[in-house]
Amino acid sequence: GSEPLLLGEIWQDGSQFFTGDAFDSVMNYKLSFALGDLFLDKGDAKAADYELTVLRQNYPKEALYDLMNIVDSHDTVRAIYKFGGGSDSVAQPTKKDFDYNLGKARLKLAATFLMGYPGMPTIYYGDEAGQYGSSDPDCRRTYPWGKEDKDLIAYYKKVIGVRNAHKDIFARGDVNTLKAEGDIYAFSRKADSGKMGIVALNRGKAQQVTLPVSAADGTVFTDELTGTKATVSGGQLTLALGENQGMMLVQD
């Protein structure tokens, strides 16, 4: 449009800026804390969901759906580094002094969440390629040209593709928490047409998860990331979630 989007770098609740005379929206550091610190790092889905629910209640829908959703930034520890147990320090690590594979697995979960949640999913440059780093300024390392993690890039492309293919659901649909307990966090998105999508995340060991859903019995959902199908029975959808696995399911 002819008017630029005014986005504020605000770390706290940004409600006071949505009165029409300040910002259109803000960087969503509140989501970064809930998703990154409480859920993916500490395994407390209930606490994470509480923070996100308060956010949804406080913000006008127009601002909520325009939030700059992040999991890390130029001012924070790189997500892959934190999720892999890296230390939050101004000292620059000279080697991968963290569990890269664990960090990568949970970064994939973060990407899945961002692509399924209301707001503008934002990727801090290099996250998709496996760049790591501790506190500012170490988090501002250059892009790892020629050393990119191609598997991670492919995963980012896949979840971005799912969001783009189902914008009516994952970009614009209503959101509702289905389960938030320990290592499991799941929420639904519902388009104006009534078609549903579900994002289910497991940041722990493999387990079977049962979710309450409003869809009719016999309704089939397909995970757009793996092709796995699940059918609603008794108002519930049962999923077999692998270790550190995320799903983006869409109603057939």
Model-found features: residue ranges?
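Active-site-proximal helices and loops of the catalytic beta/alpha 8
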Residues: 1-70, 113, 130-167, 177, ...
